[in-house]
């Protein structure tokens, strides 16, 4: 609510999307009852680990969320023994990699800074243990005498620092909340960003019983917010993107066409191939698509039997009628954690919460054996034949390597659909958002080509019209084009951009120069 009061987009991700309360409070836009999500996957009385809620926010405004949280739960005098500050960021141990290892060792040994800096800058972002092998393959360093005794010693020592702690750093997204003053529970220091930070990592704060909130900056959320703003400014349409219908046929037609550059989660070459073959027609199809395109299902060849059954080339293989309602939507293929939980509960009669504990145990070899020893007698007692139990067990055991949380996929599918909706119905505003916030995997030149294919023109850089961001302009004929931003100029600073905008309008070059 604090974020939305500031017009900052927020959305839940992860298993928290399976909570009906999260949905009713507006934290998650996905209805867990409509999509068969299970609360037990997120939180249950039997769960040993503390649940956490991951919140996606606009990447461009993530620190504003931090400020809101600390303003509400923090204390400006947090260093005082009487402080009631109940929140802080979480630390993580920054370990040595190649560049900082060679720099720190070189400085400690008193080697020439210019020489050490040249070596460090020449190294790619690699493990410190690979420094020597990498340096041998860099021709630009042949002029340096890397075999000199002190230099060779520095390289050898730097390699030995691989993976060792360098210093404490702020975790990129974790904030910890407490029901009392944090100084009574953990050591706290001020981090480089000016926020209080507990000196425990993410695992340590959970071990002492503190609740962790992950605030993740997502560029697609900033892209969507930018597009919605441009739609309102140019088209005078107050679009509530969170309320658009999830059954818009033109949107699914665009996804099926595989022209998905810029669309969240489905723009990679592999995903474009999959959406073309799967041909999503519903929101559930998007959830399945996102879940299937994971390393596990791809390596386990789970996609082919699903597609064959989906398109009627082969019948769906559902091992037992009791499992039909669980596996029908995925054509008999086990894709989701929630399906495993339901299968175990159905065949053994235990609660969903207990079934989730069994699912978690499948992640280790020891746990698999323990579950196996329990599962066969429990399912036999419920009247299932040994052949059926064995087939189901083989599926459950294999699932440990390729399962995915349906609630997580559903939370991802929502911005996937929303970004596809914007690209379908408001392409200029969508392209302006993508070019401004760069949420995807492709360079801007490809997105500019995509804009042209969508019929969206590109207006050149203009000191009188270009702003800090890419914006939509409408011509006299009603056509939309995107104006290139001043920030696209290489090397330009924020101060220079502000100065240019403040000094408008400019009559000519000499006026601009003055």
Language model feature labels by segment:
Residues 1-514:
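Noncatalytic, beta-rich nucleic-acid-contacting surfaces in large DNA/RNA-processing enzymes
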